[in-house]
């Protein structure tokens, strides 16, 4: 994020009326302002970090329409990938195992309490059956594939970004 983007985002946050100064509006303002600054068109935004699994009850309180996609990858592949990144937290197996366990517990809790708000997706399935999995994701979040991929074969670009052929 550039200095100008940070300032614009702070200006937008400061412009929120006191009545609307809450976590949900602050987060929404940050995501939408950043998206607009990058000239991106979107109707949904999301967070792809595992950190958000620690805040699921708060997220549901602030964003009652929130949905969660748990993208799970074979742990052996995760360890192999992250072992190549010097200083990455995944190089500490006990910490990584605790984070993974917390994420799985959160998934199970969501599946039990709010089954309509959670989707389980294996990374390997996304890589090998990209088009099918993207259709399922679109269905889950309530978007058509045409909205998500406005040009033909756009899903192939997703597969390319996943590092597959």
What are these regions (language model features)?
Residues 48-49, 58-83:
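Conserved phosphate-donor/acceptor-positioning beta-strand/loop module used by diverse small-molecule
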Residues 52-57, 130:
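Short, well-ordered alpha-helical microsegments
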Residues 47-50, 123:
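Short His-Asn-centered micro-motif
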Residues 37-39, 106-118:
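A structural motif corresponding to the C-terminal end of an alpha-helix
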Residues 1-48:
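PAPS-dependent sulfation machinery
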Residues 69, 77-101, 160:
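A glycine- and Lys/Arg-enriched "phosphate-lid" helix/loop adjacent to the NTP-binding pocket
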Residues 112-165:
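The conserved 3'-phosphoadenosine-5'-phosphosulfate
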């Amino acid at each position: 994020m550039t200095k100008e983007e940070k300032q614009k985002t702070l200006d937008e946050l400061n412009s929120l009326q006191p009545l609307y100064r809450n976590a949900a509006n602050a987060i929404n303002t940050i995501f939408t302002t950043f998206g607009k600054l990058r000239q991106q068109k979107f109707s949904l935004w999301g967070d792809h970090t595992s950190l958000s699994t620690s805040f699921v009850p708060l997220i549901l309180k602030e964003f009652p329409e929130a949905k969660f996609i748990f993208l799970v990858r074979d742990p052996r592949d995760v360890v192999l990938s992250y072992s190549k990144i010097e200083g990455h937290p995944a190089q500490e197996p006990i910490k990584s195992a605790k984070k993974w366990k917390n994420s799985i517990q959160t998934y199970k809790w969501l599946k039990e309490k709010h089954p309509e708000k959670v989707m389980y997706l294996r990374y390997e399935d996304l890589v090998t059956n990209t088009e099918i999995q993207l259709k399922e994701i679109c269905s889950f979040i309530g978007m058509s594939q045409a909205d998500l991929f406005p040009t033909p074969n756009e899903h192939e670009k997703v597969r390319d970004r996943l590092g597959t052929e």
